[in-house]
Amino acid sequence: MKPSKHLIFALFALAISQPTMAAPQPIDRVAVQINDGIVLESEITNMIDTVKANARAANQSLPSDSALRTQVIERLILTRLQLQMADRIGLHIGDLQLDQAIENIAREQKMTVAQMQQKIESEGLSFGQYREQLREEITLGEIQRIQVQRRIQVSPQEITGLVKLIQEQGMKDVEYQIGHILIDVPNNPNSEQLEASSKRANAVLERLKSGEDFRRTAIASSSGPKALEGGIWDYMNINEMPTLFAEVINGAKKGDIIGPIKSGAGFHIIKIMDARGLQTKEIEEVRARHILLKPSPILSEDRAKAMLEQFLKQIRSGEAKFEDLARQYSEDPGSAAKGGELGWAEPSIYVPEFAQTLNSLSQDQISEPFRTTHGWHITQLEERRKTDATDQFNTNRAHQLIFRRKFNEELQNWLDEMRADAYIEVFQPESNRG
């Protein structure tokens, strides 16, 4: 059954009808209904203002207000659908995990949290707003990881094939920054609809070849996933990027415009915004051990953190050994029996919070308790070493490249499926109504 918008409008009508002695204020309105949720006009206005401010700061031109509004509404719809999914599966980012993320960001920027707060507030954003924006970003990242990762399979044959290619090419591949515009077509289009989309794509291509700004054109015309970023995909090598890109850009040079290319989604136009060579380098590996406690209905967040703080005191005083506590208490089945030992690995294979913590430690140092998606940890950095790229590295690299390519493709498929299954209604602004 489709959600009814009448209750929503009734609540707003009730709010409007209440007497007040204050001066009249502009009344916010429902701009979009997404399943049982809504997007307010003020949310759209605020996001448009943010995009415009960012464009001014970057000296970047923008399309018409109506085209920009369409892109912003689409972004808000997809964001809200993902947050609704997170809520349905019980995914919530708590304050302790959020605090840990903020500490990591401050550390990366070589600031204290207080200094970072001061900088944020000097730029006109309250620290409370920043926290909630970051909580939303972390939630989106986690729900994408949870929902998309399980849709991806990387076969041994794919890895073997790519390892062979990597060995043939070496690690001096080229990374491309891609500009992408998608002129979409309706579901099950007829010949007239296909022809209309094809003409639109060719018209866009001609404007680009005549020197029209790519980013502005993408924001105004593209239905692709990066439209609001000017259609720009960050640097990827040919093995990381979506298959459609990889099939057409091999050998292309900076500034080349390719297309239109027809696919099931529509007509694609691709521009090589930049290209750079990959440099080979030594790999830094770390040997570490950790103790993991997983919060549960029996073990609260605060209790898990307090237990690890107590373990730290016992280790530092010589009352207990790290490996003994790991065997007794750690809830990581892969390392607990080995005294928490994780073996040699690149830090980047771990979740971001764990990798950032390892990178901040000196040899033999034990971290303070910190939170990741897996739970609460303390970790000790035992050794660092530099190694050359090995067969195992090539295998890991191949898996990572294939996974990233498939993740980008499956993420868009997942978003498209959610949108197709959702009840969405966009209400026209008052000024556009007859």
Curated annotation (Swiss-Prot):
Main localization is periplasm
Protein's gene: surA
Per the database record, which ranges form the PpiC domain?
Answer: 173-274, 283-383
Q: Where in the cell is it found?
A: Periplasm
Provide the reaction this enzyme catalyses: [protein]-peptidylproline (omega=180) = [protein]-peptidylproline (omega=0)
Q: E.C. number, please?
A: 5.2.1.8
Q: Which PANTHER family match?
A: CHAPERONE SURA
Q: What is this protein called?
A: Chaperone SurA
Task: Write out the GO MF terms.
Answer: peptide binding; peptidyl-prolyl cis-trans isomerase activity; unfolded protein binding
* Name of the top EC class for this enzyme: isomerase
Its Gene Ontology biological processes?
A: Gram-negative-bacterium-type cell outer membrane assembly; protein folding; protein stabilization
Q: What does this protein do?
A: Chaperone involved in the correct folding and assembly of outer membrane proteins. Recognizes specific patterns of aromatic residues and the orientation of their side chains, which are found more frequently in integral outer membrane proteins. May act in both early periplasmic and late outer membrane-associated steps of protein maturation.
Keywords carried by this UniProt record: Chaperone, Isomerase, Periplasm, Repeat, Rotamase, Signal
Q: Where is the signal peptide?
A: 1-22
Q: What Gene Ontology cellular component terms go with this record?
A: outer membrane-bounded periplasmic space
State the domain notes: The PPIase activity resides only in the second parvulin domain. The N-terminal region and the C-terminal tail are necessary and sufficient for the chaperone activity of SurA. The PPIase activity is dispensable for SurA to function as a chaperone. The N-terminal region and the C-terminal tail are also required for porin recognition.
| NCBIfam families according to UniProt | PRK10770.1
Q: Does the keyword Isomerase apply?
A: yes
